[in-house]
């Protein structure tokens, strides 16, 4: 019976294929599905939380586009205030009664530098903004919080009314209720908003009062540049917020991903959720800029110093900021995934009554909250059910241990094997005697030594070549066919690696093949771990944890590789046995020719004993010379008798028998029975070498490979596969944003290599069936990926829309920004562009082009009142915005801006201004950056109410006069006909195209000024 785990093609093929399928299939399913929401009958799975109610709220607030600069945004705000009141009334509290206080914040204004404008070039002009907030905050008093309105400041001196006794800090749960002007905001961020409503409902219930106070904030203006979170900085509760949970949506459904956390301690609050999902690799990718997306997390952590988590939907990105970010294209399951995680995490953060989030900051920043000393963490989920969270310092210590200790252990094992004469690696032959006249015995220990690096380089090079080919020929194919790309690169690497390793082993079979691969994996992993350890220490990155686990496993498998050599005989003993077998063979071999012939430099003996030749046939011609033996004075070789069938097998004491000695001229002699038995021991059951491998390899354990594969394979496959899929999902559709088109392919390649590394030591034993099948897969997917159209109705290409109007001349242009090839295809389908001259140039978005045409046929209707039919278009546009510039003393001026039916106007200056003041606004907030030495080149102005006037005092240096433009933005496209160009684009663009906003305004109206 064949050993089911023997190192033979059948068992190796079966077990490796089974393990890969058993792990990869569930990982793909988990990646593509969402844990089911509780049934309607079990809607109260979490006491006090109602999923049906939350879903109904979602459908209400996503009936229209609701950017900050829209009328429906105001309706959404009113609806949310009403829902908060209903929830509190249902919980037995209302307004400021009891343990809950509602803040309808219409007072917080913020003036400061735009974070994205901060550049390292000294003296460069930058961008500033003035914003008026409309946030809604609900404070749920904790059991340990002070009584009364402890947050109020006295009118005199700005000091607290009293010293707050509880220093444990508050927990913030945050979401934004505005959407982009081209998306309904179901996922971004409607689900976060309705989750916040349920969080209020849960903690407002008397039975669920939190230990530490919880602040639920529904902020407004996030989409235009995180303005709502900036306005929080002016609220009296903000200094007491120590931790936060930010709820976001950078996709349109799926699972809510733990995208970022500030430290290990806050991550622990999330760890116990029923369906965790996320990895620290995504967090580090954000920090390094590989994933472009800004959320309120940036303000809460970077500016205010709060510690917290970013829980966000992240796919599919093709629906993000489009009209398919609606309730139809998401699910209750996705909502429940975020809602259940938010309730759990907020409860854990609030329930920490120790000193975890209290105390001095390690950076000593005085303008940030004192919330203790965080520690960097490493975290990831397992199959969407388990969650691992440990300290980065611990991983750093373990990395150092692996780097230092494991080479020493392997060196020690190698030394012991060498002393025992059992180290077969890197040994070509062995000498059994010290005399130079005796030729060495071949061991074959170098066979297979350099196969792995050659196969790895060739397979990797071919896989990378295919990735670059895709980038060159059809770069967006991964946009909608990522699994086709994954299958292509996976199958190519597998087949190429197998072909080289199997071919090399066929040409020169080696029992050390698996061992050499483990040694190479150790060397490669050790070098990689050095780099990972440096990033852990210097840059505080935990993304290298798969390498740490992989190298730990490789160290163990390499150690086992050395340990199995202990089962082998000593090299010299084995060599002597081979020599003896050859002695018997040559002793009985019939000989002819000159018996004095002797080779000057005898070749090494072959390693395989001539067992069938121990008893020679009766008739056989041979060119072997006759042998002689003597004491140096006996040279009578010619008298030596040729043995025949009558010659005794065992020599006697007579003189004649003394002539029958071996070719090795040794005085060592054994009985023929001992020689035969010694030779036969290599042919006993279980000791036979596999096929044509080295004869001594028959004693190697045939089952050890199985346990080595279990050590190296499953955990590495799990980490690499689920992390790779998550990262590919995060970036494979970012090419439309102008991101690097090669990056998704490189991620696929890198994690393909990681997934397949565990099989490399045994891949040469796999039968041809799997590799040939994968070759067919590669050919099919390669052809498909080269010729298929990259977009589909389910994965639409996003193009960026803006309409620009000169309010003085009434000239207007419709512009689409994107990749040149596809922008032209989209514009070609638009009736208003037919026959028009389309001009293209560089876009403000990197790596994209801007293609524009005359929009006279699709002129927007932006005013709050409908003009008379015979009113000239020039007069209509001139009345949309006015700017009055009044010169003051020196280089000072006052600008008065009024705009109809909008809340946003921006001032652009030809020469930077050195100072400004918005009358009725707030002072400059240094937390967002010092006033730049190079001045301000653009000032963005936002009002709470549409149609209000801005009065801005400015001053400048050097120039005699100040020139610039006022750019007002209109973003409300809910009423058909308001922006006909957008309506036309949504109606007539190809089914594979989606339209999203280019900037804050769908329409930008410009008017110049000079003073």
Curated annotation (Swiss-Prot):
Cellular location(s): Vacuole membrane
Transmembrane intervals: 10-30, 396-416, 450-470, 484-504, 515-535, 547-567, 700-720, 743-763, 770-790
Site feature: Transition state stabilizer: 320
Active site: 222 (proton acceptor)
SUPFAM superfamilies tied to this protein: Zn-dependent exopeptidases
Glycosylated residues in this chain: 31, 50, 99, 109, 837
Family according to the record: Belongs to the peptidase M28 family.
Protein role: May be involved in vacuolar sorting and osmoregulation.
UniProt protein name: Vacuolar membrane protease
Organism the protein comes from: Podospora anserina (strain S / ATCC MYA-4624 / DSM 980 / FGSC 10383)
């Amino acid at each position: 019976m064949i050993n089911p785990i023997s190192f033979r093609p059948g068992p190796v093929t079966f077990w490796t294929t089974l393990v890969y399928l058993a792990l990869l299939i569930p990982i793909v399913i988990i990646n593509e599905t969402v844990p089911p929401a509780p049934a309607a009958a079990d809607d109260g799975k979490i006491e006090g939380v109602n999923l049906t109610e939350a879903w109904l709220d979602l459908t209400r607030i996503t009936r229209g586009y609701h950017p900050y600069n829209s009328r429906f945004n105001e309706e959404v705000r009113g609806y949310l205030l009403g829902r908060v009141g209903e929830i509190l009334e249902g919980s037995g509290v209302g307004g400021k009664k009891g343990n809950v206080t509602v803040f309808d914040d219409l007072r917080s204004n913020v003036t400061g530098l735009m974070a994205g404008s901060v550049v390292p070039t000294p003296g460069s002009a930058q961008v500033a903004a003035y914003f008026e907030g409309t946030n809604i905050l609900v404070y749920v008093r904790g059991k340990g919080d002070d009584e009364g309105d402890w947050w109020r400041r006295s009118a005199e001196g700005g000091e607290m009314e009293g010293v707050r006794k509880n220093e444990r800090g508050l927990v913030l749960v945050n979401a934004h209720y505005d959407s982009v002007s081209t998306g309904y905001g179901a996922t971004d961020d409607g689900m976060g908003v309705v989750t916040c409503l349920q969080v209020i409902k849960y903690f407002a219930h008397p039975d669920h009062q939190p230990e530490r106070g919880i602040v639920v904030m529904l902020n407004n203006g996030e989409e235009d540049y995180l303005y709502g979170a900036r306005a929080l900085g002016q609220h009296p509760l903000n200094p007491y917020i120590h931790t936060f949970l930010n709820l976001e949506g950078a996709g349109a459904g799926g699972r809510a991903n733990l995208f970022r956390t500030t430290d290990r301690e806050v991550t622990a609050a999330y760890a116990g959720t029923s369906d965790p999902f996320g990895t620290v690799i995504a967090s580090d990718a954000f920090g390094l800029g590989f994933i472009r997306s800004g959320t309120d997390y940036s303000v809460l952590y970077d500016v205010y110093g709060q510690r917290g988590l970013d829980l966000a939907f992240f796919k599919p990105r093709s629906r993000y900021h489009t009209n398919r970010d609606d309730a139809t294209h998401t699910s209750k399951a996705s909502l429940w995934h975020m809602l259940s995680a938010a309730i759990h995490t907020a409860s854990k953060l609030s329930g920490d009554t120790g000193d975890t989030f209290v105390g001095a900051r390690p950076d000593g920043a005085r303008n940030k909250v004192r919330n203790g000393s965080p520690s960097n963490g490493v975290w990831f989920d397992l199959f969407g059910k388990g969650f691992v969270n440990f300290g980065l310092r611990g991983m750093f210590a373990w990395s150092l241990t692996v780097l230092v200790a494991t080479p020493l252990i392997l060196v020690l094992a190698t030394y012991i094997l060498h002393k025992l004469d059992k180290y077969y690696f890197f040994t070509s032959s062995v000498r059994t005697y010290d005399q130079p006249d005796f030729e060495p015995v071949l061991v074959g220990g170098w066979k297979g030594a350099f196969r792995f690096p050659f196969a790895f380089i060739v397979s990797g090079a071919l896989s990378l070549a295919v990735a670059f080919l895709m980038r060159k020929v059809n770069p967006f194919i991964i946009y909608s066919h990522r699994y086709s790309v994954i299958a292509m690169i996976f199958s190519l690497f597998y087949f190429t690696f197998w072909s080289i390793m199997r071919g090399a082993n066929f040409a020169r079979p080696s029992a050390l093949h698996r061992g050499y691969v483990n040694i190479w994996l150790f060397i490669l992993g050790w070098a990689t771990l050095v780099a990972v350890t440096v990033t852990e220490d210097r840059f505080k990155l935990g993304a290298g944890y798969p390498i740490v686990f992989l190298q730990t496993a490789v160290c163990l498998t390499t150690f086992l590789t050395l340990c199995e050599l202990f089962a082998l005989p000593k090299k010299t003993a084995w060599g002597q046995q081979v020599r003896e077998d050859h002695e018997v063979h040559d002793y009985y071999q019939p000989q002819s020719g000159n018996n004095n012939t002797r080779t000057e430099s005898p070749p090494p003996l072959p390693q395989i004993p001539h067992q069938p030749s121990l008893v020679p046939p009766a008739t056989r011609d041979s060119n072997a010379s006759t042998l002689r033996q003597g004491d140096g004075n006996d040279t009578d070789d010619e008298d030596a008798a040729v043995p025949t069938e009558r010659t005794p097998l065992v020599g006697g004491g007579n003189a004649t028998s003394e002539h029958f000695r071996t070719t090795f001229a040794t005085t060592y002699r054994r009985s023929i029975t001992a020689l035969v038995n010694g030779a036969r021991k290599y042919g006993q059951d279980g000791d036979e070498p596999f096929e044509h491998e080295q004869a001594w390899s028959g004693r190697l354990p045939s089952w050890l490979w199985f346990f080595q594969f279990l050590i190296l394979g499953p955990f590495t496959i799990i980490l690499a596969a689920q992390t790779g899929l998550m990262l590919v999902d995060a970036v494979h559709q970012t090419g439309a944003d102008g991101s690097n088109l090669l990056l998704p392919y490189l991620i696929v390649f890198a994690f393909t290599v990681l997934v397949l590394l565990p099989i490399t030591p045994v891949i040469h034993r796999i039968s041809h069936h799997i590799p040939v099948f994968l070759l067919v897969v590669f050919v099919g997917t390669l052809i498909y990926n080269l010729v298929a159209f990259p977009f589909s109705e389910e994965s639409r290409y996003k193009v960026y829309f803006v309409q620009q109007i000169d309010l003085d001349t009434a000239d207007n242009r419709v512009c689409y920004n994107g990749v040149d090839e596809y922008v032209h295809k989209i514009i070609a389908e638009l009736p208003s562009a037919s026959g028009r001259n389309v001009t293209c140039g560089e876009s403000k978005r990197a790596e994209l082009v801007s293609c524009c045409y005359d929009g006279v046929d699709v002129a927007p209707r932006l005013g709050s009142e409908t003009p008379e039919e015979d009113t000239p278009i020039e007069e209509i546009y001139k009345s949309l915005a006015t700017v009055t510039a009044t010169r003051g003393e020196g280089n000072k001026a006052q600008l008065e801006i009024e705009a109809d039916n909008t809340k946003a106007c921006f001032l652009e200056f030809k020469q930077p201004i050195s100072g400004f003041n918005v009358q009725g606004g707030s002072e400059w907030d240094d937390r967002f950056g010092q006033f730049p030495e190079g001045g301000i080149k653009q000032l963005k102005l936002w009002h709470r109410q549409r149609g209000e006037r801005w009065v801005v005092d400015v001053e400048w240096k050097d120039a005699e006069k100040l020139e610039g433009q006022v750019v007002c933005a209109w973003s409300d496209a809910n009423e058909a006909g308001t922006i006909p160009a957008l309506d036309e684009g949504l109606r007539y663009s190809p089914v594979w195209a989606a339209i999203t906003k280019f900037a804050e305004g769908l329409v930008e109206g410009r008017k110049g000024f000079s003073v």
